[in-house]
Structures are given as C-alpha cells and as structure tokens.
C-alpha cells in the first residue's frame, strides 16, 4: 500500500496536468492528503463508489501515460546517474563550486 | 516553414505515443517524409481537406502536450547545461574517460 501511494504520488507529480479538474481533486485528496474514500465522498457530495471508480480510472490513466512517455522512469535513471557522476567527481576532487552549481541546475530540471 | 517543421518533428519525437495511429501516419508523412497534402490524400484515399484538418488538430494536440508537460523545453534546457558542464570539465582537465562515459549515459536519456 505504501509503495503504491508512493508511486501514485510520483506519477501524479509528472502527469497531473493531463488529468481533469475532478480527477486531480480526488486523487490529491486520496493519495496526497490521505483522506478515505468515504471522507472524499462526503466532501464532494457524491457516492463512495463514484469516487472509487474515478480514482481507479485515474490510476490507470497515470500508468498508461507512464507506459507511453516514461517520464518517471527516465527521471529515476537520471537521478541514479547524477549520483554516480557526483561520486566520481567528488572522489577525484573535481567537484569544485562551478561544476557543483551546473550539476545542481541540471538536477533541478525534472 | 522550416522552423515549424523542425519544431513539429521534435514534438512528434516526444509525444507520438499519445497520438492515434492515423494521426501518427499523417504527421510522419507530412513532417518527417515531406509528402504534400495531396500526396497523402492519394495514399490514404481520403480528401485533401480531411488530411489538412487532421494534421492541424494533431499540431494543436502536440503543442498542448508540450504546454502541459514541457518535455521538449526541459530537454533543451538540459542540453544547454550538459554542454556547459562538458566545457567546464574539459577546460579544467576533469573530463576523464569515466566521467565522460557517465555524462554520455546521462545525455542519452531523452
């Protein structure tokens, strides 16, 4: 469960702009703010089942986008290589202020 | 015109998986293979107008995806910073084989 929440949060970070306003709202209440389905249902005055179905479909959409675009996967590959690069540069004493700064700028582009 | 073709090719590279089979086909004939609308119409046995409308809508979709996800923009920002980093490392004699290799791997993740 924790792993799924974590993955959904990450996918949401990358693809939320492709979701509808309603999808965004439900998913962020559920995964980011940890509301229960019942609480979200009350908040939006719709049935618990409607919330459940909507979130379920959104999860499928997010996985579909990831399958097609792979933004999360590429991000994680990049993170791993940035760490390796940083370790290599540090070990060789190559990580001076300028190099460090450029590397930081690179890492800040998600 | 050349600039637009170039941009459409780049956007197509990033977002083609989000297009329908037909959209992909028309756009790649038009922008990648430089067919005329008339030639594509003949190829698919539909009207020139239908091809035009479809490609026009696809262009709008590609721009919309870029607006929402910014994969091309981020790619270009990254390219620029990779060049800077490489220049800095080269100038300081820090670009040895290992560092070069890790950097190449990083650049190969689009």
Swiss-Prot record, chains A, B:
Annotated protein name in UniProt: UPF0122 protein lwe1821
Source organism, top-level taxon: Bacteria
Role according to the record: Might take part in the signal recognition particle (SRP) pathway. This is inferred from the conservation of its genetic proximity to ftsY/ffh. May be a regulatory protein.
InterPro entries named among the record's database cross-references: RNA_pol_sigma_r3/r4-like, UPF0122, UPF0122_fam_protein, WH-like_DNA-bd_sf
Cystine pairs: none
Coiled-coil residue spans: none
Pfam families in UniProt: UPF0122 (PF04297)
